Amino acid sequence: MLHPETSPGRGHLLAVLLALLGTAWAEVWPPQLQEQAPMAGALNRKESFLLLSLHNRLRSWVQPPAADMRRLDWSDSLAQLAQARAALCGIPTPSLASGLWRTLQVGWNMQLLPAGLASFVEVVSLWFAEGQRYSHAAGECARNATCTHYTQLVWATSSQLGCGRHLCSAGQAAIEAFVCAYSPRGNWEVNGKTIVPYKKGAWCSLCTASVSGCFKAWDHAGGLCEVPRNPCRMSCQNHGRLNISTCHCHCPPGYTGRYCQVRCSLQCVHGRFREEECSCVCDIGYGGAQCATKVHFPFHTCDLRIDGDCFMVSSEADTYYRARMKCQRKGGVLAQIKSQKVQDILAFYLGRLETTNEVIDSDFETRNFWIGLTYKTAKDSFRWATGEHQAFTSFAFGQPDNHGFGNCVELQASAAFNWNNQRCKTRNRYICQFAQEHISRWGPGS
């Protein structure tokens, strides 16, 4: 089994050789160095795992401790690049001269050694040993020493790693090329001086929002910043599945709610069941929570008639879902505004209410009015209460602005009754709508 440690004698010999060879292998090995047939394949899975684990372990051992050190993940594409560069055996190529490698924003650690002198694990360990000659406080390497392997290996913002190895020949000698590629690259310079590779501080104390998790294996000295296993900071109940991209629970049949915490056994007598909300959409002429109540159309309570539809404006305030239920009990739905005409007429009418005594509830929240539009995280779009997609829109400037927290839509008085997404628990007045098809099928006195 390979270990990063080497015997004292062999380690000293390797250190001397590395110091002699340096990092710019094209300057050490002559142009007549010839490429040999590739080794039998690239690094195998076990070798890749060993190198990745070693890199992360060494990154957790830096002193002083790193506050922003990222955990490295293996990249097959970087491994292919590293394998291709190892196969060059140190020979300059037009692509290298043109800066192709630099445009890829890839950082490199490279070494040529006599074949069989060292394993890849030992080479990486010796790169890390360069850190003994590096001063983090001064941000520089000791005089006449090389530390660039070390600084790239522990560059905090590098998050992807891939390595390759190739056997070359130089006359009678067999030479082994070791290459590791890192992305994003490190060893950036300012005014000719390489900046420090990481910020010192308590482990994981300066992780960015996208990598706010803290990874620490059993053999790590400190933690490494990583994409959190559960960035949503939530879990789904009753065998629901969490989509960490949308922070939405996909519930099994029979359950609903944000966390699949609500058992839904509702039966719709005269209507269709909406599983995502555990509610019924009633057939024409029926109302109530289960669409079991026969209702009569109350012509005398229409506040507005627009293209045959009846709109009723409530005088009391309630939360969005209670308001929707109250409309349904009457055989209607929360208003669905599907054209500029309806929007303009409702805005004009509600604006007049502001100057009359028709607002009987003094609650400050009742200046706004619920309509039947909500944001559905599962569909990543706003939908009407009947499930239809929202085509027409009249959101106020800067709205909608808080998906996931303000999922219900109101007509906002301060924005000339254009739309605003709001917390569903807010108490607003509301507008019920009875479609023309409802009215024609019920008929007067039915």
Swiss-Prot record:
Keyword Endoplasmic reticulum: yes
GO cellular component terms given for this protein: endoplasmic reticulum; endosome; extracellular space; Golgi apparatus
Source species: Homo sapiens (Human)
Pfam families given in the database record: CAP (PF00188), Lectin_C (PF00059)
Localization annotation: Secreted; Endoplasmic reticulum; Golgi apparatus; Endosome
Entry's Gene Ontology molecular function annotations: polysaccharide binding
Signal sequence bounds: 1-26
Gene transcribed to yield this protein: CLEC18C
Span of domain EGF-like: 228-261
Tissue expression profile of the protein: Detected in peripheral blood cells.
UniProt key word Secreted: yes
Function comment: Binds polysaccharidesin a Ca(2+)-independent manner with a preferentially binding to fucoidan, beta-glucans and galactans.
Record-given protein name: C-type lectin domain family 18 member C
SUPFAM superfamilies: C-type lectin-like, PR-1-like
Domain SCP, first and last residues per copy: 52-182
